[in-house]
Amino acid sequence: ASLVGSEMCIRDRYNAKNFIMNYLDILPLIPAEEDIVAAVNNDFTILWILLSGILVFFMQAGFTALEAGMTRAKNGVNIAMKNFMDICVATITWVVCGYGLMYGAKTAGFISLGSDVWFNEGAGAHDVFFQLVFAATAATIVSGAIAGRTKYSTYIIFTIFMTAIIYPISGGWQWYGDGAFLADAGFIDFAGSSIVHAVGGFAALVAAAMVGPRIGKFDGGKVNPIPGSNLLLGALGVFILWLGWFGFNGGSQLAWGGADSAAA
């Protein structure tokens, strides 16, 4: 019995030693707690940016409903197609050159001409998507200002120009990072009040001045009201846009949590 007990004791010690040695071998492979936390935060950040981008994307439906409801019924299909093409055209132009013009290496002062992030090369897909829906929103602001007053083909040409050149260059002045001359001068734009809405608004002002008033709006110096075709549809559009603002502001901190949460 004493011999059997000694053998079991030796075996237990051998197994314990092997366990300890194996544990020490794999210990370097176990990520540290802070690495796990950082990885989880990064995953949640990507998820949050994607969800916020989806909310902003859905604002296209809000703009469509608002514009269609507040204009004549005959313009409904034209408005729907213009807003649909906004996101389609913006996707192509943004991936090909828009994102590169906004965030590429600065080689010409006020403009990014570096090709390091053209065609999404070297860029996070979630960030490209989030910035894409911002660019599409800037373009669709113009759609509302000239609803029912311009050709479909003309608007598509403008959307290409807006999302490929105007918005990326103006956005890079503020959001590029080090070297963005507006940011370096102390200018602050948290969620696009100027870069998206002011740029889109000024473009809309120029477009409205170019196309002129709607037919029948002015007659012999008298202003004729043109009521909307469906106020309920317009109200629905307002609520959809309201919902989308939470993605606009909440996602603009580009992180899950952090000090900017209160600002959002």
Segments from the language model and where they lie:
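Single conserved hydrophobic/aromatic residue that forms the stacking wall/gate
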Residues: 1-12
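Generic extreme N-terminus detector
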Residues: 12-13, 25
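Hydrophobic alpha-helical transmembrane bundles of multi-pass membrane proteins
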Residues: 21-264
